[in-house]
Amino acid sequence: MISSEQAKQLYADRFEKDKKQSSKGGWHSDITFEPVPSDYAILRLTELPPTGGDTLWASGYEVYDRLSPAYQSFLESLTATYAQPIFNESAEKNGFQIYSAERGSPENVGSDLKAVHPVVRTNPVTGWKSIFAVGHHAKRINEVTEAESQHLLQWFVQLIVENHDLQVRYRWQNPNDVAIWDNRSVYHTATYDYDGVRTGQRAVSLGEKPYLDPESTSRREALEKAKSR
């Protein structure tokens, strides 16, 4: 369930700040801290605030395509650690435990909520590469220093927020609106500009363990080849 009221209870620290000066930390792909994370997600909001609360999505294909070939090759050699310690902290503060049995896959067990995946991932449906290590689940680029890791993770988000043409924004109109997206190559965030209640249901399916196919291509390369035929 997606609930603004539940979020205020579970993550009270988030809502106690006087002035909100940046919302870029909201960008993420769903449950990338699992060894087998989500492929598709479905979201329906059944209770909407009077104004605000839009959802934004951004293209991981396009983030990858905006990098130089040299940087693309460098990032393809890296892995990242994905984790969500805030969930465990919230569970401890609020007196419940993280579900530690199989969460949709035999590999998604335990309460650590931590996994290692490539920085650049191939989408098995399209065969295109995208930057995967984006958002608040991506904690550390493993093969570089801490300073270099933070620089890269912040830069990936910066590429999203400074390029509106790789984003799409949806204004929820009524309880029958449904959004479906592919977490393997798309990031999303809510827009926290509302005061009313925002409630809904989200379901995710599980895909495969993220991988990089060295024979895969970029979206831009694939479209250029299609044009030349």
What positions do the PLM features span?
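Fe(II)/2-oxoglutarate oxygenase catalytic core
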Residues: 1-180, 184-229
